[in-house]
């Protein structure tokens, strides 16, 4: 604390303008003291200036990532919620016991920093786990993946991603997990997930992606089916998503464009079942009275077996359209159920928030 105290050098930070340095692995609820000094190099020798006056900083206690539902803590509370009572089609297809709370909505431990502003985005099934992506609305903390047990539907751990991207899309190809990264998609091996689970820690930091493939437009959503990674961009009008063949899964994955498919405006998520049924979510805005509002889940049977000569796959007419509560986002299929994720629990303006991943019998979404 005093000028006579012994200080340990933490870092040498280079830069000619304002610079910053993030110090990790500090003890919670502990006061640390810091002094800085300017330096320069003369003929290869580092010359340091006088140390500054000591400045103190106390680390805060970081709460564990929340496991429970943000708004409705029990089944009784949820079944009395405006969304459950109002959206009859969702209610009739829903299996409450297979549904589960979206973790991290109250607070998320992001590598030792507490974040209460995570917004859920994408959902996929990867082996024994559901993976949920989320980004920090305030853009202060890195984006994350919540790992949830497929069998127990309970939150296990968090994977902290190496960027603050919006991570709207996530998919699993049987070997690698793919994730949105602006005008690119990045991949990392499934072993990252299993290692994070086996580590038994509250979070694991992913230092870098295994591969990054650049695109010509923003990757807002994605889904995997039959060795093709389908990637699309959220748009206010009908748009075209692209299907990419995945190369070198076991080594350094890369993508080759192969197909296209038209999708409706305001598409937020896609997923596929083993028979090739495509489940597509559309949503925009939190209030019905707002211009352009929509929130629905659609099912299609695309003509995958007979693409046109230019690679276009017809999605065909929707088999069924199910009106959903506001802000439906990612979707995943496990067994005979479709799981839908919502971001509405973050927005105070939403009168029909859903703080759970809702499991719905797929047969009721296609008939």
Q: Where in this protein do the model-derived segments appear?
A:
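Loop/turn-rich, solvent-exposed surfaces of beta-rich toroidal or solenoidal domains
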Residues: 261-309, 327-329
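Conserved blade-ending motifs and adjacent loop-strand segments that build the rim/top face
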Residues: 307-334
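Sequence/structural signature of beta-propeller modules
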Residues: 61-111, 358-367
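Repeated scaffold domains used in trafficking and secretory/extracellular systems
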Residues: 115-122, 164-171, 211-224, 263-272, ...
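Extracellular fibronectin type III
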Residues: 28, 40-63
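Beta-strand-rich domains and repeat architectures in extracellular enzymes and scaffolds
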Residues: 103-141
């Amino acid at each position: 604390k005093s000028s006579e105290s012994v200080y340990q050098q933490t870092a040498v930070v280079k830069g000619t303008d304002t610079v910053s340095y993030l110090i990790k692995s500090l003890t919670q609820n502990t006061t640390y003291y810091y002094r800085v000094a300017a330096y320069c190099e003369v003929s290869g020798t580092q010359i340091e200036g006088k140390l500054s006056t000591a400045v103190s900083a106390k680390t805060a206690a970081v709460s564990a990532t929340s496991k429970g539902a943000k708004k409705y803590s029990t089944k009784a509370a949820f079944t009395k919620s405006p969304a459950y009572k109002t959206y009859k089609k969702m209610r009739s297809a829903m299996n409450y016991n297979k549904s589960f709370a979206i973790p991290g909505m109250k607070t998320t431990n992001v590598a030792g920093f507490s974040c209460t502003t995570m917004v859920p985005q994408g959902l996929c099934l990867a082996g024994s786990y559901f993976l949920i992506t989320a980004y920090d609305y305030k853009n202060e903390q890195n984006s994350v993946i919540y790992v949830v047990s497929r069998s127990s539907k309970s939150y296990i751990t968090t994977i902290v991603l190496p960027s603050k991207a919006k991570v709207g899309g996530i998919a699993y190809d049987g070997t690698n997990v793919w994730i949105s990264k602006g005008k690119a998609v990045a991949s990392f091996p499934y072993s990252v997930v299993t290692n994070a689970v086996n580590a038994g820690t509250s979070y694991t930091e992913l230092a870098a992606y295994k591969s990054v493939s650049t695109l010509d437009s923003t990757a807002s959503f994605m889904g995997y089916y039959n060795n093709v990674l389908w990637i699309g961009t959220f748009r206010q009008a009908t748009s075209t998503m692209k299907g990419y063949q995945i190369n070198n899964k076991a080594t350094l994955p890369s993508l080759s464009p192969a197909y296209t498919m038209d999708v409706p405006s305001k598409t937020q998520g896609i997923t596929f079942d083993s028979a090739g049924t495509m489940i597509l979510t559309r949503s925009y805005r939190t209030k019905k009275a707002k211009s352009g509002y929509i929130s629905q889940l659609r099912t299609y049977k695309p003509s995958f077996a007979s693409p046109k000569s230019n690679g276009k796959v017809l999605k065909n007419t929707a088999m069924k359209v199910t009106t959903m509560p506001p802000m439906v986002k990612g979707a995943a299929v496990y067994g005979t159920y479709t799981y839908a994720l919502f971001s509405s629990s973050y927005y105070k303006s939403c009168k029909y928030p859903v703080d759970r991943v809702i499991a719905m019998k797929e047969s009721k979404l296609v008939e």
